[in-house]
Amino acid sequence: MAKIVDIKGREVLDSRGNPTVEADVLLDNGIIGSACAPSGASTGSREALELRDGDKSRYLGKGVLKAVANINGPIRDLLLGKDPSDQKALDRAMIELDGTENKAKLGANAILAVSLAAAKAAAQDQDLPLYAHIANLNGTPGQYSMPVPMMNIINGGEHADNNVDIQEFMVQPVGAKTFSDGLRMGTEIFHHLKAVLKARGLNTAVGDEGGFAPNLASNEDALGAIAEAVEKAGYKLGTDVTLALDCAASEFYEDGKYNLSGEGKSFDAEGFADYLKGLTERFPIISIEDGLDESDWAGWKILTDKIGEKVQLVGDDLFVTNTKILKEGIEKGIGNSILIKFNQIGSLTETLEAIQMAKAAGYTAVISHRSGETEDSTIADLAVGTAAGQIKTGSLCRSDRVSKYNQLLRIEEQLGAKAVYRGRAEFRG
């Protein structure tokens, strides 16, 4: 049985040019597992703490040398000699060493990087693909599926410097037969969308997640442009391709009002729920993420009651990959899906627990990147290894996004006939 003989942390850059944490876990047989922690822009208030230095003389205060020092010091000392395959023991030990509710002492970025690096080392040690090792850790050995990609092809909100309030407009190739076919469909739509925007005299620069970020008259205008691109690509909207939104509503919620500054409109919770309901009636939108503010549970209940039978309502800032919060949401009938982000909770073990709790309650689980990413493609293996069925990892450009899609293509090839792609069956309604 291999043992951990060294752990190394370092400061690297993410896709926004901000520092993040990378960790190496070295085993006594020479195997090395490496992983990076991602970082978000629109974040939930109850996420685990991303430890940054606050030293304005380095990286505008965003350095992560404190987190790196925690890896190279106390975390390393704690885990030396441990079995890398006992993921739960490693993660629990780090959580106990931290001793805070939100990992504020060691930093969720430090704990997560080591947690994922250990999983990668353990997978290599057992001569397993990472997705297979994750399935074993999840208690579902050999149960895999290829996720439906939710491809963010127009960026707004905190992910772009434009006037569009809703943060993400996504296409889902639900009519594809395989993941690779779905990826091709999304890519073709992406290129046609560029032509549609150019023909309208609009900017085709991209946002943080690789989607186009033009100024548009309204959120409905963005959906209309995508609908035109789908048609020009030769696909049928609502059958071959469906739509999804990430409102990130907490970013435009203030004093009990949802303020769409790009449209000059303001709503109370019921009014905004009706606004979203109207969009789902005019377009084949089958998933809405963070449709209401994370603290507006009454509003979430209104939205769930209005459209929850037909539309996947995903809690991101709402649930922050946290089983305590998710449990409360399930009990109160809030939403019907959870977004899964490693760094919101800070360890692989806790991430798997959130997925398991969601599935047991009949909620869907959507595996997700962050807007600040690296070349690390672990979420691709997580999606397949947990058979989550859905993945959000951005648009069809920027290597920090495409690296995840390319890993999924490799996994699909490895699985061969076992590479199940369920398409529309992964969604509600």
Curated annotation (Swiss-Prot):
User: Looking at the UniProt record for this protein, which Gene Ontology cellular component terms does it annotate, in alphabetical order?
Assistant: cell surface; extracellular region; phosphopyruvate hydratase complex
Pathway recorded for this protein: Carbohydrate degradation; glycolysis; pyruvate from D-glyceraldehyde 3-phosphate: step 4/5
Q: Which GO terms describe its biological process?
A: glycolytic process
Q: Where in the cell is it found?
A: Cytoplasm; Secreted; Cell surface
Report residues binding Mg(2+): 246, 289, 316
Task: Provide the alphabetized UniProt keywords.
Answer: Cytoplasm, Glycolysis, Lyase, Magnesium, Metal-binding, Secreted
Query: Per its UniProt record, what SMART domains does this chain match?
Result: Enolase_C, Enolase_N
Q: Per UniProt, where does (2R)-2-phosphoglycerate bind?
A: 167, 341, 370-371, 392
What job does the chain carry out? Catalyzes the reversible conversion of 2-phosphoglycerate (2-PG) into phosphoenolpyruvate (PEP). It is essential for the degradation of carbohydrates via glycolysis.
Q: Which family does it belong to?
A: Belongs to the enolase family.
What name has this protein been given in UniProt? Enolase
Task: State the organism of origin.
Answer: Pseudomonas putida (strain ATCC 47054 / DSM 6125 / CFBP 8728 / NCIMB 11950 / KT2440)
